[in-house]
Amino acid sequence: HFFSAFDKVRGARQGRAADMLAEVANRAADEGVSYLELMVSTGMSQMHDQAGASGESHEQQWVRYAALAAPIVEQVSAITRADEAGMREKLGCAGPSPQPGCSVTIRYLSEVNRTRSVDEVFAQGVLAHRLGAADPRFVGFNLVGPEDSPRALADYRAQMTVLAWLHRRNPDFPLALHAGELAEGLAPPEHLLFHIREAVQVAGARRIGHGADLAYERDAQALLQLMARKQIAV
């Protein structure tokens, strides 16, 4: 299973961020790709540990989580700077024979875990927004994790509402959503009818990842036309 692979390689990647960046940059250059947006979760586990149901309004939560996020933002930026410096060293970017990956522009999308509680999703979303405000390398965020997990299915509409609030709070920070990564037999059929539409119309996603069940969406043709008008890619 795709999602089970991550834990199997977690140990092997520890301390190898610079190596991985160098490898993916070189591969991109070899394939004629000059710009990458890499999804990263640095700092997110620290943020969801701070979350919890509080009865506060979203505005009150934003203020509290933004304060908690401030030192994490500094840590993530420092880690990213160090990883990129290590990448440039491995690629020889300052030397006489730089490798092809030196020419590739790398930016980052923060990962927010959709299998967490709604409060944790909100907290991680605040961190993503604060990272984007503080560090221009962080250009947006995304939801990750199995879309057909019990928590992700049960909370899907609540998560879209939270993301919509964050979008209204900071409309210039892009959201790219994995949505419609569902199939018959793996998720209740009613969920195949609305996930992509709500990602677009409620959460304000500017890009959709996967979108595999698009044909099952209610009035799929109208949804496609809407996405074409808004230039929302899949």
Report residues per predicted region.
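Metal-cofactor-binding active-site regions of metalloenzymes
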Residues: 1-233
